[in-house]
Amino acid sequence: MTTGNGQSQQPISNLEYDFITVLHNKAEAVKAYDCYIKDAQEINSQPCVELFQKLRQSEIEQAQEVRHHLQQVM
């Protein structure tokens, strides 16, 4: 719903909410990968450690991109 001046009466736009939700999910994924890396280290599986580190880094990079877009729409 919008007011007469075209502004939404919602505290944040749907797009802002979407970006915040994605950013939260990326942060949770990074935290999960930390656990997965630890598990792989405990059984001395270097290939698994490296894979989880690569996936974790990808999540971080995606989170940074999402954050940039969120700043643009706020």
Which residues fall in each region the model found?
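Iron-associated oxidoreductase/ferritin-like identity signal
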Residues: 1-74
